[in-house]
């Protein structure tokens, strides 16, 4: 595990939960940055390095461990990994629902934040106007999301259902 890539974590927002999930991801990003700063401060003191030298060294180790050929410039500051997994929710004219993963989830621990009793009008693909969804509709979106995540190779799936 690297100090700049500490966990393989992904967060999915259910339909209508984008605002709440955005707040959670913002908090997680702050925790990642705080953790990196604490670890990097301890390592720079212990090894007599500057923070820039440490970031360069850790990036080198990550590049050596990676199977991909590194491209682009060397990072000058720590950037928190993007934890949000984008999903496109679609509702068809016959009432069927579909969840389509936009971002890859292979090997990630995925957290799905979903509110099955949300009674606010929700805009999803396939609908012209925002529509109030029933609990059954929300459950079907949840089931199709879990199914898509498992088929895409996620390491684990955890449901966060704030209502119940």
Show where each model-derived region lies.
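PRPP-associated nucleotide enzymes
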Residues: 1-164
């Amino acid at each position: 595990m690297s100090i700049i890539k500490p966990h393989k974590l992904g967060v999915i927002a259910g339909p209508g939960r984008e605002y709440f999930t955005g707040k959670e991801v913002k908090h997680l990003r702050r925790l990642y940055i705080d953790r990196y700063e604490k670890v990097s401060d301890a390592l720079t003191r212990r090894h007599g390095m500057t923070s820039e030298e440490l970031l360069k060294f850790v990036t080198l180790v990550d590049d050596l461990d990676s199977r991909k050929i590194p491209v682009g410039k060397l990072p000058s500051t720590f950037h928190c990994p993007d934890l949000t997994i984008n999903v496109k929710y679609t509702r068809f004219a016959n009432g069927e629902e579909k969840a389509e993963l936009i971002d890859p989830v292979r090997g990630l621990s995925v957290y799905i934040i979903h509110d099955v009793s949300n009674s606010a009008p929700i805009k999803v693909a396939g609908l012209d106007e925002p529509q109030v969804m029933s609990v059954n509709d929300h459950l079907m979106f949840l089931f199709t999301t879990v199914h898509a995540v498992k088929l895409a190779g996620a390491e684990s799936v955890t449901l966060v259902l704030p209502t119940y």
